[in-house]
């Protein structure tokens, strides 16, 4: 079957737009820290959630370059893409290697009154993530895993009213999601600190941080542990759809 060049162009455009929208809609921020130098931590999603590095050092790490924190931080301006509401699903994944200091350490936080999430190390050196509506504060831990690289994942499934924590791809805790009030705030996002004023600082290294506006499956989390970050390949380069798209169109029309 033959078709006009204009019709073919339209088909290609529609297919690529569908591919891009389905691959990019779910990942709202992704920091690979592969820049290796400079004061910018670029967001690999389409949302432009780039961060500014304040003092953290670029070093070799788990996958290529990583950021090492010694009472330093990255500031990401507030954005609605990760300012999750009280009824919104979301997931967070990251690689972490931290020091056991017997004190609070802010890892990834949007903290100001109620908050949609905070990843933190507590004084027992346990890594966890929590949500707060200024009354209820559900959180899920993975224990003291300091001193070596580990993959941490936190998942909120609002339909099930559950939150989950994973360590190296394995489920650690399942807790009730008791949130019933506002979690949104106007705070910026800090990587390596808690909040404005740069209190509750982090000591360690971080890599491959990704935030999603949906529930990640256990299979996807295991894939991330193996280095395959869900949704990232197409979010970073929408053109990667094009080869498959064009191949399918050629089969159909020629």
Label the predicted regions.
Residues 28, 32, 37-41, 70-128, ...:
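Extracellular glycan-recognition modules
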Residues 2-72, 173, 222-254:
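Extracytoplasmic low-complexity segments
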Residues 142-144:
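Short, flexible loop/turn segments at beta-strand junctions in immunoglobulin-like
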Residues 177-178:
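Residue-level structural signal for beta-strand termini and adjacent loop
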């Amino acid at each position: 079957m033959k078709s006009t060049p204009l019709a073919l162009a339209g088909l290609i455009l529609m297919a690529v737009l569908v591919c891009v929208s389905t691959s990019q809609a779910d990942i709202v921020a992704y920091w690979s820290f592969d820049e290796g130098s400079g004061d910018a931590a670029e967001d690999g999603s389409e949302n432009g959630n780039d961060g500014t590095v304040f003092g953290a050092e670029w070093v070799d790490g788990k996958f290529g370059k990583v950021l090492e924190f010694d009472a330093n931080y990255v500031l990401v301006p507030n954005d609605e893409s990760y300012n999750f509401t009280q009824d919104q699903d979301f997931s967070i994944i990251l690689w972490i290697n931290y020091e056991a200091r017997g004190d609070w350490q802010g890892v990834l936080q949007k903290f100001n009154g109620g908050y949609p999430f905070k990843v933190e190390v507590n004084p027992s050196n346990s890594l966890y993530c929590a949500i707060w509506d200024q009354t209820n504060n559900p959180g899920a831990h993975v224990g003291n895993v300091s001193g070596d690289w580990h993959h941490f994942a936190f998942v909120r499934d609002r339909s099930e009213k559950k939150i989950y924590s994973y360590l190296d791809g394995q489920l650690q805790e399942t807790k009730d999601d008791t949130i019933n009030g506002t979690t949104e705030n106007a705070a910026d996002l800090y990587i390596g600190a808690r909040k404005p004023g740069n209190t509750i600082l982090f000591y360690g290294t971080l890599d491959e941080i990704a935030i999603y506006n949906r529930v990640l499956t256990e299979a996807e989390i295991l894939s991330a542990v193996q280095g395959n970050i869900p949704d990232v390949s197409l979010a970073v380069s929408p053109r990667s759809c094009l080869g498959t798209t064009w191949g399918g169109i050629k089969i159909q029309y020629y």
